[in-house]
Swiss-Prot record:
Native species: Paraburkholderia phymatum (strain DSM 17167 / CIP 108236 / LMG 21445 / STM815)
GO terms of molecular function: fructose 1,6-bisphosphate 1-phosphatase activity
Keyword Iron-sulfur: no
Reactions accelerated catalytically: beta-D-fructose 1,6-bisphosphate + H2O = beta-D-fructose 6-phosphate + phosphate
Protein name according to UniProt: Fructose-1,6-bisphosphatase class 1 3
GO biological-process terms attached to the record: fructose 1,6-bisphosphate metabolic process; fructose 6-phosphate metabolic process; fructose metabolic process; gluconeogenesis; sucrose biosynthetic process
UniProt gene name: fbp3
Subunit text: Homotetramer.
Pfam families: FBPase (PF00316), FBPase_C (PF18913)
E.C. numbers: 3.1.3.11
Amino acid sequence: MRHANVTLTRFLAGDADHLMTTRPPTALQAVLHEVAASVKTIASALARGTLGDSAHADSVAGGAVLAYATRRRKLAETAARNRGADDAGKPEYQLAFDPLNCPWNADINGTAGSIFSVMRVQSQGSDADGAADTCAQAYGELDCEPYDEPYGAPFLQPGREQAAAGYTIYGPATMLIVTLGEGTHGFTLDGQTDEFMLTHPSIRIPAETGEIAVDASNERFWEPPVRRYVHECRDGRAGCRERDFSLRWSDALVAEVHRILMRGGLFLMPRDYRTRSAMRGRLSAVYDASPLGFLVEQAGGMATTGRERVLDAAPRTFHERMPLILGSASEVTRIGRYHREHDLGIDAPFTSPLFRERSLFLPETSL
């Protein structure tokens, strides 16, 4: 079957068996359908922008979160109806959903996105006091309020255990990028049919890249291996890399990762020494690093903290932060090697001399 005719519903039902050999369980399909419905509502709210009764971006972001909360209640009610008496209080899956990542971009009509992660609930992981309480805890966004141990337990395990992950990017077109462990696939929202259509099957990230996304304003707080890597990229053809790189920063996590999935690149949000909390990293392990790392790896890329594979890290708390470096495999491998060399004390000390050796013949001007 040609992928141009495949909707998200048909994809999850197994109609694209050339892309996914295993049909996802019915309960997981239900979660992903509700995620799709939620992001459609969020996309509609964002498209109105400031045409409502407020001229502030905060109201747009608040409306998007409220739209998700409405879907969340419906999803919990559906889970309760489908749950037998013996299974009461035992949801099969739990969803971590960041409904509006980087909401400040709405103020400038910039790109925003949603990120989600789905974990299977272990049989021994649910011991809630009652079915009603558990039903309310079955699904929810971890960034809005604290959750108790019965809810969060499924997320306190390595990211490689995710059942599904994805993000939505709200741009000129609304796209849903999703993985269920068999490749990373992109769906575009058709404005006429209101259906997500499979437009980017089996996304692959090029192994080599010349584009780096990093906030260079934090350079003075970086660890030496990160500074070493970025400076080598800046030196371009005149340096040891012997080729030019393009550095950029948009302060939009989903947009940066989407660009990498579409055309390759490297994203760096390393730990730094600006604050005590930043030394542990700046991105959420549960609903930023883990789902995005899953998507990138399934597309042939790599994701690391600098010292550890992201999907091997098990967060200890719901709100744990971690550094994130992801993208084209060759560059992630290189920066991982720089971290190992630094930790072993075998890397060349990083220097930034005031005066460099110069020549009348510069490599970057040669033909």
